[in-house]
A protein has these predicted regions:
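A cross-family "folded-core" feature that marks the main globular domain of proteins
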Residues: 2-117
Length: 117
């Protein structure tokens, strides 16, 4: 698996043959260069984009959302998949990470969250 694009220190786009893979892991992109072999021991999760739209959205996500929220969302999804014995669409990562960041920001600003139920 070779580095194709580095989003940040914790996320990169890799190529394995003709397959593009989004690789997540603490420090997986740190001191990497395009064309180098991905450090396997740093990989926590791999996503196999179905289309260019997902890769574009993920690129925007990594520039707008802290890695911790992506990591939390990834862990939540992995736990749910294991417990429910199912696979979720990879788009869930993008929406869930964004939602978590927004919820934390509201909480830190002490903005009320009303539940009308």
């Amino acid at each position: 698996m070779l580095v194709k694009k580095i989003f940040n220190n914790n996320v990169l786009l890799a190529e394995d043959g003709d397959q593009e893979i989004v690789v997540i892991g603490r420090g997986v992109g740190f001191q990497q260069k395009i064309g180098q072999v991905v450090a396997q021991q740093k990989i926590e999760k791999c996503y196999y984009p179905k289309d260019q739209r997902w890769t574009t959205l993920f690129n925007e996500l990594t520039s707008a959302i802290a890695f911790e929220y992506i990591e939390i969302a990834s862990h939540i999804i992995a736990t749910a998949e294991a417990r429910l014995d199912t696979d979720f669409d990879d788009y869930l990562l993008i929406g869930l990470a964004d939602h978590i960041q927004f919820a934390v920001a509201r909480q830190l600003k002490a903005l009320p969250i009303k539940n009308e139920l």
